[in-house]
Amino acid sequence: MHRTGTFIIVDGLTGSGKSTVLNAVHDWALTCGHKRFRLQDWKESKPPRFEDIPDFDVYFTFEPTRNWVGDAIRSELSRVDDPYGGEELAHAFSLDRQMQYKRLILPALQAGKTVIQDRGVSSSLV
């Protein structure tokens, strides 16, 4: 049986209240008794695969990640000399996004789970 999950992206400008909304949704999921996975709490260097953490009801993710490609992006974005142009950063974000979707988000949705993400592709388009 094919199950389809729910995918919600919370996006907006810096300071627009994304974290406030996400924290409220997380607290709501907690009071409802849902098992929650927060990518920000993942401590391993490799990004998680769904098959390693399948027992959660709600997955809270974000972009860019803090593993592999996402960690490199964050490191490079913090450089003062900023040697990268917008197109190069878009490619880097795209690779990070693709890895997260293939490893975690799409399998979770196919298993009928809920994924709530802080930022998404719309952040890259602005």
Range-by-range predicted roles:
Residues 18:
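Conserved lysine of the Walker
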Residues 1-5:
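Phosphate-binding P-loop
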Residues 10:
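Hydrophobic anchor at the beta1->P-loop junction of P-loop NTPases
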Residues 27-54:
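Post-Walker A helix-loop "phosphate-sensing" segment adjacent to the P-loop in P-loop NTPases
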Residues 44-126:
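ATP-dependent small-molecule kinase phosphotransfer cores
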Residues 15:
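Walker A (P-loop) phosphate-binding loop of P-loop NTPases
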Residues 21, 25:
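Hydrophobic positions on the alpha1 helix immediately C-terminal to the Walker A/P-loop
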